[in-house]
Amino acid sequence: MEHKHHHHTNESVSAEEALALLKYMAQHNAHHAEELQATADSLSDNAALLIREAVSLLNQSTEKIRQAIQESEG
């Protein structure tokens, strides 16, 4: 499975660029959460539980990013 990440440096970015990056990251994280959830179904009970807990935390983080987007747009 090929997966590409575009890593960003600590260079200053405009507010518009930051907002675009946040939107991308929220969507990207949501996609990974879906993949992880599906993967959990193939694991042992304890491992699946740990992955589902991780997905929950990832979803919480993604929601914080979405809130930041709303604040920035608002």
Model-identified regions with their sequence ranges:
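Short, charge-rich amphipathic interface segments used for partner binding and complex assembly
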Residues: 35-71
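Short, charged, intrinsically disordered terminal tails
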Residues: 3-8, 66-74
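N-terminal acidic leader/helix
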Residues: 4-32
